């Protein structure tokens, strides 16, 4: 797979096989970010149908969209994202990585450009994904199909989201802190192959190594998930 100017020199890739509850998934991302020395890509799964909603979305708005699904507030921004039939991933970029100095929008676009190329290379959904492209917003009124009810992330494409036949299939949200940048993304295609994950990783970095979540990180994340992400104070903070 040909690649030009990948975002990272080296990337640690974690394909987490265990479906986990939303609060634990969010906590694992935060703990990995706090310990990232370079860049980490994590693919993960959910143990039940759920929605995640951005830091600035109100609980009242998110609960309307959730229905009877589980809910978790993200540390990142963005809108409301359905989980369970998607492939969810996160990228943690440590502050000592050269990539951390890039503008957040540039990181967003480059991640999605690699994702788009990986989708087209593996073509997991047949001819549909062969026409995947990045969204380019020319002005606020150029798309009449945008539906902003309930802050629905996938009804509201922003620049560099991944589109197929006019519909958004991949988006992400970010948070940048002194210790690094967290990029949390969702691809609304749950049947993507291991080959897709491999090619996506290859396109992001000059080299990547596979790893797993160690017990110390998992233990710390379990405590953080219980005390922060599963707590009413966090869920109802807005």
Residue ranges and their predicted role:
Residues 69, 95-113, 162, 172, ...:
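Helix-start/capping segments and mature chain N-termini
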Residues 2-66, 70-74, 80, 90, ...:
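Active-site loop/lid in soluble adenylation, ligation, and acyl-transfer enzymes
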Residues 79, 83-98:
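Residues forming anionic-ligand binding surfaces in small-molecule and nucleic-acid pockets
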Residues 15-18, 151-179, 184:
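Short terminal or interdomain "cap/linker" segment that borders an active site or interface and mediates
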Residues 3, 79-85, 148, 174-179:
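Short glycine/proline-enriched loop/turn "hinge" motifs that connect secondary-structure elements
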Residues 112-147, 152, 174-238:
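Long, positively charged amphipathic alpha-helical accessory segments at protein N-termini or as interdomain linkers
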Residues 48, 66, 82-86, 157, ...:
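Short connector loops at helix/strand junctions that flank enzyme active sites
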């Amino acid at each position: 797979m040909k690649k030009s100017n990948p975002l990272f020199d080296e990337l640690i890739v974690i394909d987490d096989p265990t479906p986990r509850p939303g609060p634990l998934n969010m906590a694992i991302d935060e703990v990995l970010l706090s310990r990232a020395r370079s860049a980490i890509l994590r693919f993960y799964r959910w143990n039940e149908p759920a929605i995640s909603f951005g830091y600035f979305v109100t609980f009242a708005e998110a609960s309307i969209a959730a229905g009877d699904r589980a809910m978790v507030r993200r540390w990142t921004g963005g809108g409301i994202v359905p989980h369970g039939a998607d492939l969810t991933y996160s990228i943690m970029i440590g502050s000592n990585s050269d990539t951390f100095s890039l503008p957040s929008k540039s990181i967003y676009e480059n991640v999605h450009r690699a994702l788009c190329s990986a989708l087209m290379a593996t073509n997991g959904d047949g001819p549909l994904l062969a026409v995947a492209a990045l969204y380019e917003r020319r002005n606020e009124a150029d798309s009449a199909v945008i539906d902003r009810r309930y802050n629905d992330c996938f009804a509201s494409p922003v620049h560099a989201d991944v589109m197929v036949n006019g519909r958004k299939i991949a988006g992400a949200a970010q948070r940048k802190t002194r210790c690094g940048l967290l990029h949390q993304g969702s691809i609304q295609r749950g049947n993507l192959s291991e080959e897709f994950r491999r090619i996506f990783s290859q396109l992001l970095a000059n080299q990547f190594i596979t790893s797993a979540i160690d017990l110390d990180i998992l233990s710390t994340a379990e405590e953080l998930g219980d005390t922060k992400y599963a707590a009413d104070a966090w869920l109802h903070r807005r």
